[in-house]
């Protein structure tokens, strides 16, 4: 009963193979999946998929690499799509200083606006941050986190940074990057954070975990992330799966449904 809290079954790489991917995931114990739409094509495809499969949920937002195209019309579009009954969060939103497809000031403005929308809609928000941890932290700190909290997606910082985000009301989600040999800082965070503050994800088709590193990632491979973190923490994979799934269901508001 593993919950992949962040996957992109809605991208072109998986077109025509979604049934196969979902079946493989189920076979490997990944029984719930959150499909993240980050621009109009991926949002539309995500909504089509969640209407077809009971075990799929959807997160909708405007990715920081798309911040330059954020307009009032886009915001109206998002607000309309966020009404879908299987929407569990707003995202992925944040800052991306690696690609820098929009100026920092524009990314910050769009990030702040979407945090506010998430609070207005009583939804948790999912954060993408790349080469921008400090600014991401300061924006979340100044905007505040709503009662539903937020998720640091595919976390790649230190334990110290993870604890700072947790103190703001965020939960830390670990992807296949935690399995990489040189990811010792991320591994320390996955080992030491309180159990109720961690989630697991794939970010498929990106960032495949060991032993599949370098290949196309699959939502089924959440199993390898669970196995790795469970070993780090000295617990069984089943125990970690139960806890992280319960965490996801609580944050996404599925525990009361």
Please state what every model-predicted region is.
Residues 1-257:
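Mid-domain alpha/beta scaffold segments of enzyme catalytic cores
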């Amino acid at each position: 009963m593993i919950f992949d809290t962040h996957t992109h079954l809605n991208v072109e790489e998986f077109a025509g193979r979604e049934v196969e991917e979902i079946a493989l995931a189920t076979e490997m114990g990944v029984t719930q999946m959150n499909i993240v739409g980050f621009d109009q094509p991926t949002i539309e495809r995500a909504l089509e998929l969640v209407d077809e499969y009971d075990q799929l949920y959807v997160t909708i937002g405007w990715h920081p690499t798309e911040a330059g195209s954020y307009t009032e019309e886009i915001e109206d579009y998002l607000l309309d799509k966020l009404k879908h009954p299987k929407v569990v969060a707003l995202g992925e939103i944040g800052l991306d200083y690696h690609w820098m497809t929009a100026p920092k000031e524009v990314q910050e403005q769009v990030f702040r606006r979407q945090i506010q929308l998430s609070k207005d809609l009583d939804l948790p928000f999912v954060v993408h941050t790349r080469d921008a941890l400090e600014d991401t932290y300061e924006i979340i700190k100044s905007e505040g986190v709503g009662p539903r909290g937020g998720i640091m997606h595919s976390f790649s910082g230190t334990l110290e940074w993870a604890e700072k985000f947790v103190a703001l009301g965020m939960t830390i989600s670990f992807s296949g990057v935690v399995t990489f040999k040189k990811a010792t800082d991320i591994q320390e965070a996955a080992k030491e954070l309180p159990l109720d503050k961690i989630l697991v994800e794939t970010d498929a088709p990106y960032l495949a975990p060991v032993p599949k590193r370098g290949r196309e990632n699959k939502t089924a491979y959440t199993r390898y992330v669970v196995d790795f973190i469970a070993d780090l923490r000295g617990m069984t994979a089943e125990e970690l799966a139960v806890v992280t799934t319960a965490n996801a269901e609580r944050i996404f508001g599925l525990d009361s449904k």
